[in-house]
């Protein structure tokens, strides 16, 4: 057993609230006095349908989702949504637009380009413009008014970039399709500004295995009949999310996280905590006199994924190893970027961030 508290800074699957894990432990063999473990419940049983209903209603309340939006709990991860969004929403359109700001939006653009006859246009490219160290302002996006949609990722987990203000387009422009996997529920925004939102659960929602999709009802009219039902949003909605067996336990766990977030005071309260956590780390980096380096333009820095490095790769490796010995785990940066990455999603307590900042200062004292 570690001499230190264990703090999980993984980008995903990520830390879950301790209170949620405790509830899951207590209910592992007997959910709510039913005698059934959730993992062994039929997805069509009244017991599970109640879990699903409450999870959907709690998420709708937390995000203030309007009545004309449908919520789905699907499988396949956010990566599948790169394809599903294009397959469902681009049918009959000559073009759709994509904004590339980092690793995952780049992959989304590439995948969308393969699976539709619609031309996927680059509305903006942060790599070409800023070497992925800044974000192209929304007002500079080259959006075609008659495009099917505009796809973007609001937070880039690999590169440590995040739009300070959640992007929105003026009335009459194509609907926004947004990958919110690594920031959903971390700050307030208006769902009505978007046509479709999707998010893999394993960062801010729950364990891996479920993907949340929030889609405006009128867009479902676009879903073509010549794609497989399992990839058709309308098929899932027409069957109340039961087209195939959903990820029952991941949905149950996500529902527990929604209840936990409500108990914290909701999204507005957790947003203030997240702001303080990010500020703590960036002040440590900026106050290190160059020992720690974050090259992202300050206004584009992510509050969810803080990336940084030291002067050389060997020192970075030493940092990761020594941090883990003190219970600060999974800080190694993404393979294509290197350095370190501290993912500080909703469930990461402020104490964990402060422990990391203390370690960073001590490491600098010893090796600076």
From Swiss-Prot:
Cross-referenced Pfam families: Aminotran_5 (PF00266)
Function summary: Catalyzes the reversible conversion of 3-phosphohydroxypyruvate to phosphoserine and of 3-hydroxy-2-oxo-4-phosphonooxybutanoate to phosphohydroxythreonine.
Name of the protein described by the UniProt record: Phosphoserine aminotransferase
Highest taxon above the source species: Bacteria
Keywords assigned: Amino-acid biosynthesis, Aminotransferase, Cytoplasm, Pyridoxal phosphate, Pyridoxine biosynthesis, Serine biosynthesis, Transferase
InterPro entries membership: Aminotrans_V_dom, Aminotrans_V_PyrdxlP_BS, Pser_aminoTfrase, PyrdxlP-dep_Trfase, PyrdxlP-dep_Trfase_major, PyrdxlP-dep_Trfase_small
Cofactor(s) this protein cannot do without: pyridoxal 5'-phosphate
Cofactor info, note text: Binds 1 pyridoxal phosphate per subunit.
Family label: Belongs to the class-V pyridoxal-phosphate-dependent aminotransferase family. SerC subfamily.
UniProt cross-references to PROSITE patterns, sorted A to Z: AA_TRANSFER_CLASS_5
Residues given in the record as pyridoxal 5'-phosphate binding sites: 78-79, 104, 157, 179, 202, 244-245
CC annotations in GO: cytoplasm
E.C. code: 2.6.1.52
Binding site for L-glutamate: 44
PANTHER family for the chain: PHOSPHOSERINE AMINOTRANSFERASE
Principal location listed in the UniProt entry: cytoplasm
Listed pathway(s): Amino-acid biosynthesis; L-serine biosynthesis; L-serine from 3-phospho-D-glycerate: step 2/3; Cofactor biosynthesis; pyridoxine 5'-phosphate biosynthesis; pyridoxine 5'-phosphate from D-erythrose 4-phosphate: step 3/5
Signal peptide: none
Cellular localization per UniProt: Cytoplasm
Quaternary structure (record): Homodimer.
GO BP term (any one): L-serine biosynthetic process
UniProt-recorded Gene Ontology molecular function terms: O-phospho-L-serine:2-oxoglutarate aminotransferase activity; pyridoxal phosphate binding
Modified residues (N6-(pyridoxal phosphate)lysine): 203
């Amino acid at each position: 057993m570690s001499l230190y508290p264990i703090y999980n800074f993984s980008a995903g699957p990520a830390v879950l609230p301790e209170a949620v894990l405790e509830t899951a432990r207590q209910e592992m063999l007997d959910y709510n006095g039913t005698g059934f473990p959730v993992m062994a419940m039929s997805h069509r049983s009244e017991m599970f349908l109640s879990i699903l209903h409450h999870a959907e209603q709690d998420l709708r309340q937390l995000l203030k989702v309007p009545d004309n939006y449908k919520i789905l709990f699907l499988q396949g991860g956010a990566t599948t949504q790169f394809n599903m969004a294009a397959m469902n929403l681009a049918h009959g359109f000559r073009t759709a637009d994509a904004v590339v700001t980092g690793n995952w939006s780049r992959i989304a653009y590439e995948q969308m380009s393969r699976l539709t006859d619609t031309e996927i246009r680059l509305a903006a490219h942060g790599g070409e413009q800023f070497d992925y160290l800044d974000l192209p302002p929304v007002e500079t996006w080259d959006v075609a008014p008659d495009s099917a949609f505009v796809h973007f990722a609001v937070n880039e987990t690999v590169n440590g970039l995040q739009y300070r203000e959640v992007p929105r387009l003026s009335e009459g422009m194509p609907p926004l399709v947004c990958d919110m996997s690594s920031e959903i529920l971390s700050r307030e925004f208006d769902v009505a500004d978007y046509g479709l939102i999707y998010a893999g659960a394993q960062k801010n929602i729950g364990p891996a295995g479920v993907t949340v999709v929030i889609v405006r009802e009128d867009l479902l009219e676009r879903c073509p009949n010549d794609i497989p039902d399992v990839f058709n949003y309308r098929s899932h909605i027409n069957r109340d999310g039961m087209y195939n067996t959903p990820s029952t336990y991941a949905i149950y766990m996500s529902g527990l996280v929604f209840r936990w977030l409500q108990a914290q005071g909701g999204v507005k309260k957790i947003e203030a905590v997240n702001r303080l956590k990010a500020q703590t780390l960036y002040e440590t980096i900026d106050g290190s006199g160059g020992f720690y380096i974050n090259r992202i333009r300050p206004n584009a820095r992510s509050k969810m994924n803080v990336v940084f490095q030291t002067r050389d790769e060997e020192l970075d490796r030493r940092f990761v190893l020594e941090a883990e010995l003190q219970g600060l785990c999974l800080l190694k940066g993404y393979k294509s970027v290197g350095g370190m990455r501290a993912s500080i999603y909703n469930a990461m307590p402020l104490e964990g961030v402060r422990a990391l900042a203390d370690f960073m200062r001590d490491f600098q004292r010893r090796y600076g």
